[in-house]
């Protein structure tokens, strides 16, 4: 399985993601510059966290127009896998690949912490290695992570089972329905504010995030 990690000006978690996919999982991984227009060789595209284009206008608003993003949209439309982490989640909502939006945190402060999450659904390839209702711990680091959607969109997301992760216990940023991560209706595109790549190597204090990536590989082996 070949991974691609998109690099925008201002990305700062791209090497962390590549460390997980290339070094921990031993999978071929390519760094994809934001001006690239050929990603046909990739099975999985990951848009990492950071501050793409300095978060000018609003988070993800400029990155959405990068040449590579049209290719990412087409990649997703083919049913291929896409993951957006933190700023990557914001980019995916701006690009229309995921519903809703990410607004300023409720208290208007940047939050950096480890938080418990409940795995709401394992119907997506992204969460198949977890158990429904499992509580995991992942780091968060964001100033604009409050998930928002209008009432109709929120109801649709809930009814379709698109919420994959919720904040367990205290809601750190005011996200509606404690939403921490959602997928598209097909389940191949995932956006999440917590950072699974920062909880993949036990040396960092936890490895709950590694299963997110391992589940994909296990599925490929099962189908081989």
Curated annotation (Swiss-Prot):
It holds the Pfam family GATase_5. GO terms for biological process: 'de novo' IMP biosynthetic process. PROSITE patterns: GATASE_TYPE_1. The keyword Nucleotide-binding applies. GO terms for molecular function: ATP binding; glutaminase activity; phosphoribosylformylglycinamidine synthase activity. Residues 3-224 form the Glutamine amidotransferase type-1 domain. Part of the FGAM synthase complex composed of 1 PurL, 1 PurQ and 2 PurS subunits. NCBIfam families: FGAM_synth_I, PRK03619.1. This is Phosphoribosylformylglycinamidine synthase subunit PurQ.
């Amino acid at each position: 399985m070949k991974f691609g990690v998109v690099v925008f000006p201002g990305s700062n978690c791209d090497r962390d993601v590549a460390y997980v996919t290339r070094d921990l999982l031993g999978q071929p991984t390519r760094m994809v510059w934001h001006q690239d227009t050929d990603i046909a060789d990739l099975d999985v595209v990951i848009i990492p966290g950071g501050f793409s284009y300095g978060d000018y206008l609003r988070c993800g608003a400029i990155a959405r127009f990068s040449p590579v993003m049209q290719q990412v949209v087409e990649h997703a439309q083919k049913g291929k896998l896409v993951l957006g982490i933190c700023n990557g989640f914001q980019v995916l909502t701006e690009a229309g690949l995921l519903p809703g939006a990410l607004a300023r945190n409720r208290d208007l402060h940047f939050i950096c912490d480890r938080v418990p999450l409940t795995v709401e659904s394992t119907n997506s390839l992204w969460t198949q290695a977890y158990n429904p209702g499992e509580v995991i711990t992942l780091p968060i680091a964001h100033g604009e992570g409050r998930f928002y959607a209008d009432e109709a969109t929120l109801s649709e997301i809930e009814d379709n089972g698109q919420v994959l992760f919720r904040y367990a216990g205290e809601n750190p940023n005011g996200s509606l329905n404690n939403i921490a991560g959602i997928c598209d209706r097909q389940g191949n595109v995932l956006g999440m504010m917590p950072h699974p790549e920062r909880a993949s190597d036990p040396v960092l204090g936890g490895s709950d995030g590694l299963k997110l990536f391992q589940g994909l590989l296990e599925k490929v082996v099962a189908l081989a």
